[in-house]
Amino acid sequence: LKLKSGQVEGYAEGQEPLVYLRTTVQAVMRAGCPFVFTDGHGLAKFTRWFDEPAHLDAIDWPLVRDRFWGDTLDDSDRKRRKQAEFLVWQGLDWDVLDGIGVLNAGMQQRVQGIISGYPERKQVPVHVTRHLYYP
C-alpha cells in the first residue's frame, strides 16, 4: 500500500513496474537452489525460519491468500503472518520460472516483448494478475 500511494522514499513509479515471478518449491529443489522460508515477516523477532519443505504447513496459507492485511481484535498477528517469505540464495535460473504476473495488459505486452527478444530462452507465460496488486 505504501508503494501504491507514494509513501516509499525515493520511489514514485507505483505498482505497474512490479512483476511477480512464479515457480514452485519442487522446481527450486530440482534446480538445487538453496532456500529458506518464514512463517511471517522476516524482521520480526518471533518469526520462525525453515529450510525444509516439510515445514511449509507452518505458513498460514489462507491468510497469505487473503486480500486484507490488517490485524484484528481477535488476531493481532495477521499482518506479520501475511508477510511470510520464500527466499532463494543468490538467484534463480530463468528456466525454473513457470509464470510471470503483471498489473495490466500494457505491462504484459512490455514483458512479453522483452522475453521474445531472447528466443533461445524459455518463453515464460505472462499473465495479468490484478488480484495480486492493491486496488
Where are these regions (language model features)?
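Active-site-proximal loop/hinge segments that shape catalytic or ion-binding/gating pockets
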Residues: 1-135
